[in-house]
Amino acid sequence: MFLMVTEFINYSEQIIRAARYIGQGLMITLSHANRLPVTIQYPYEKIISSERFRGRIHFEFDKCIACEVCVRVCPIDLPIVDWKLETDIRKKRLLNYSIDFGICIFCGNCIEYCPTNCLSMTEEYELSTYDRHELNYNLIALGRLPVSVIDDYTIRTIQIK
């Protein structure tokens, strides 16, 4: 008789413990039910990127001194810098600068180590194309400023916290 009572007490304690665990899990689930949905309707809604977002690289041709620091610090030696030495003024003159965004890993080393700050990251992240050769940007394509997501009136912007 005593054995049967202790088994019943152990069984009831296990039932109470299981009900408590189920209740805790249910409370966590219900606390998430009050949150707003995270999904956005992409072409019509866009997320405002953070201040430190690493998007497409912007290049300012006039500031570049063709020092090739960006090529040396790039982990994949990606930027292609063509220059010519001007003998009369003994300085390098930049002829061409290009980056292939199909290969770029957007690490930001080129921007961080550039001595003249001619490179900067933009908030542009829409780089998809049907032909991968279109992702090879020369100095003219790198020089154009992207359309700001905030300034585009056709798109509803969403701030994610």
Curated annotation (Swiss-Prot):
Listed Pfam families: Fer4
Membrane topology: Peripheral membrane protein
GO biological process, one term: photosynthesis, light reaction
Enzyme Commission identifier(s): 7.1.1.-
UniProt keyword terms in alphabetical order: 4Fe-4S, Chloroplast, Iron, Iron-sulfur, Membrane, Metal-binding, NAD, NADP, Plastid, Plastoquinone, Quinone, Repeat, Thylakoid, Translocase
Binding site for [4Fe-4S] cluster 1: C64, C67, C70, C114
UniProt xrefs under PROSITE patterns: 4FE4S_FER_1, 4FE4S_FER_2
Stretches assigned to the 4Fe-4S ferredoxin-type domain: 55-84, 95-124
Top-rank taxon, per record: Eukaryota
InterPro entries: 4Fe4S_Fe-S-bd (IPR017896), 4Fe4S_Fe_S_CS (IPR017900), NADH_quinone_OxRdtase_chainI (IPR010226), NDHI (IPR004497)
Enzyme class: translocase
Keyword Plastid: yes
Record bears the keyword Transmembrane helix: no
Family: Belongs to the complex I 23 kDa subunit family.
Descriptive protein name: NAD(P)H-quinone oxidoreductase subunit I, chloroplastic
Source organism of the structure: Phaseolus vulgaris (Kidney bean)
Biological classification of the source: Eukaryota, Viridiplantae, Streptophyta, Embryophyta, Tracheophyta
Encoding gene per record: ndhI
